[in-house]
Amino acid sequence: MSDQQLDPQALQQEENSLIALRKEKLAAERAKGNAFPNDFRRENYCEDLQKKYADKTKEELAEAAIPVKVAGRIMLNRGSFMVIQDMTGRIQVYVNRKTLSEETLASVKTWDMGDIIAAEGTLARSGKGDLYVEMTNVRLLTKSLRPLPDKHHGLTDTEQRYRQRYVDLIVNEEVRQTFRVRSQVIAHIRSFLMKRDFLEVETPMLQTIPGGAAAKPFETHHNALDMEMFLRIAPELYLKRLVVGGFEKVFEINRNFRNEGVSTRHNPEFTMLEFYQAYADYEDNMDLTEELFRELAQLVLGSTDVPYGDKVFHFGEPFARLSVFDSILKYNPELTADDLNDIDKARAIAKKAGAKVLGFEGLGKLQVMIFEELVEHKLEQPHFITQYPFEVSPLARRNDDNPNVTDRFELFIGGREIANAYSELNDAEDQAERFMAQVADKDAGDDEAMHYDADFVRALEYGMPPTAGEGIGIDRLVMLLTNSPSIRDVILFPHMRPQA
């Protein structure tokens, strides 16, 4: 590769020259009349034709003279033939000088990669065995003014791929497939829950009190009402209000917003599934989650073995179940139960492990900090981590045998949290006390502590049946199923820092 090819300034000058030339070609099309026609109606998709006629020989296609009408973007232009791409795949189109008019042939010579064309003709097969359309008519539908990345330079800069996802989707089939899988996953989750009598609902994105999770919200202002509002961090409290109201099985797939850091696992705007079912507990949700994840793996991969990086996660085997307390001891044999139950020792262990200890944390909070620093990243195969301390679970029901912990689990796969669930707290007085404790933590400096939600307490006072709820991060789940290393790879338009 020459220095000129590597020189960004030279590349930019070359691109500007190509854009100028394409604009001249567009001007010529405008002079002919409508340069952006919208009267063509496609009748066939590229991939459908490839599959339907895969077993037809050259002679059989010639005899059948199957008429087709296709449209797509030019991805390769060799003069005598072009390759076009639509939403399903690609097919060759042949420029037949015997069947196309001189005017059409002259126009074809001016077309560039990236242009969108409509082609009519009959199916044929080349000597090499490739299916193609022998065109009897072809015309330009959209002139592309910017050249696509070529095979030498490509679109390899990761940040540019995220910023210009529209180009990324054009040139990278694996990226298109990732987002097809994402759509399949969401559609299957919806079907899975509806078959089990769950009702899909929508709850507010703008909230006066951000609740349902421990996170920092985005703040905004409602001008007409002159009031501070927040983008929701979770829909939980509204979904549980619906359970109070009699919708005993509900779910929502929608966006949450958290004003926190950006990483390969975190995006400020992300998609979450939350579902709630009355007359169930958190162990029922574990069983349901295992069933759902196995179905999704089978749907996407045709197997319950999920490859991710250099590892393989086994969804076909029962997911491990281990308490927070026991997991710390299992993965850190140098620690003892006495160490974890002594608040001074636990504080020292958390600090040594790298946790941000502020000084007001109770024993349960410190134990969770230790878990996050010393255990979480070691949970490669699917693990349900259970019995979270009640002080970090302000919305979860206390365990009957040990009131210091709750009937809660988080699902970890590949060292990442994928789901969070619990038997819901439906004792209104207990909930009010826990909200007050959260307010005290917030006053002490915990930015992620919850606000007091008086209306939610009032809803519980009307009576909520025993209920289990769960949230599953759609983005992280799709990362696993598509072997994607970054959350930005599975979000169409991830948030990016402004360009300089």
UniProtKB/Swiss-Prot annotation:
Subcellular localization, as worded in the UniProt entry: Cytoplasm
GO biological process, one term: lysyl-tRNA aminoacylation
SUPFAM superfamilies for this protein: Class II aaRS and biotin synthetases, Nucleic acid-binding proteins
Enzyme class: ligase
MF annotations from Gene Ontology: ATP binding; lysine-tRNA ligase activity; magnesium ion binding; tRNA binding
Subunit text: Homodimer.
Family statement: Belongs to the class-II aminoacyl-tRNA synthetase family.
Protein name: Lysine--tRNA ligase
Naturally occurring in which organism (per UniProt): Pseudomonas fluorescens (strain ATCC BAA-477 / NRRL B-23932 / Pf-5)
Gene this protein is translated from: lysS
